Amino acid sequence: MQQDSHTHGIDMSALGRNKQGLQLAEETVAIEVPGLSLFYGDKQALFDVSMNIPKQRVTAFIGPSGCGKSTLLRTFNRMNDLVDGCRVEGAINLYGNNIYRKGEDVAELRRRVGMVFQKPNPFPKTIYENVVYGLRIQGINKKRVLDEAVEWALKGAALWDEVKDRLHESALGLSGGQQQRLVIARTIAVEPEVLLLDEPCSALDPISTLKVEELIYELKSKYTIVIVTHNMQQAARVSDYTAFMYLGKLVEFGDTDTLFTNPAKKQTEDYITGRYG
């Protein structure tokens, strides 16, 4: 089902920059989903989804609005627990341990699996206090330890040089793109293993989006990253693997280059060529 790259508006030069020869079956698995269904009351939102998220790669979820991609993302750190009437059937194994097992420490899970949302949500505190927020919750208050964590996390989020002289000013004075990178710094300060990014660039301008995309590329050397995006160009640029979802079902999952240039399923081809969605 080979496609002319121009037919679906995806810049094929974006593909292949860091993804040569990737084989999903050969990857170390970070998150295993062996048949997951999810319900909101009587309404089923996910239907028997099975997939393996590879360690220290970027996996993108794409699909039309309402297809279940954000719902699936939020199962990875149990954010859906906060929704009344939400029920999960099946398991999600984080490095072999079922995060839905009885007695799971959900607060610790959310430290290990951090999340960044569509709209930057810095706290109405200083830049410094935003970054150390999670550390203080853990009881870490030594100034030297916090100072080092702030510098390390802000450098990791490619923000240090822009804010190092204003750490004790309000985070609300930062631009939208800076705020989103600050939120990423706050998330990585507690040293998670996985980063979940739910359309992290949808509220940002193109230049800020580019900075966040470059940051994602850098962060995958330390973290497993899963990103939900409506922007197929973005999925092509930043991800190693892509999952296409439709109406709560996983239609196709594979390396990004192949999925965009030679999809196995007609439904995937129709979506990326703009026939629907």
Curated annotation (Swiss-Prot):
Q: What is its EC number?
A: 7.3.2.1
> Which residues participate in ATP binding?
G63, P64, S65, G66, C67, G68, K69, S70
Q: Which InterPro entries match?
A: AAA+_ATPase (IPR003593), ABC_transporter-like_ATP-bd (IPR003439), ABC_transporter-like_CS (IPR017871), P-loop_NTPase (IPR027417), PstB-like (IPR005670)
- GO molecular function list: ATP binding; ATP hydrolysis activity; ATPase-coupled phosphate ion transmembrane transporter activity
Which family would the database say this protein is a member of? Answer: Belongs to the ABC transporter superfamily. Phosphate importer (TC 3.A.1.7) family.
What's one Pfam family here?
ABC_tran
Q: How does it assemble?
A: The complex is composed of two ATP-binding proteins (PstB), two transmembrane proteins (PstC and PstA) and a solute-binding protein (PstS).
User: Got a GO cellular component term for this one?
Assistant: plasma membrane
Catalysed reaction(s)?
phosphate(out) + ATP + H2O = ADP + 2 phosphate(in) + H(+)
Q: Is Amino-acid biosynthesis among this UniProt entry's keywords?
A: no
* GO BP term, pick one: phosphate ion transmembrane transport
Name-wise, this protein is Phosphate import ATP-binding protein PstB
Q: Could you tell me which residue ranges the ABC transporter domain spans?
A: 31-272
Q: What the protein does?
A: Part of the ABC transporter complex PstSACB involved in phosphate import. Responsible for energy coupling to the transport system.
Q: How does it sit in the membrane?
A: Peripheral membrane protein
Q: Where in the cell is it found?
A: Cell inner membrane
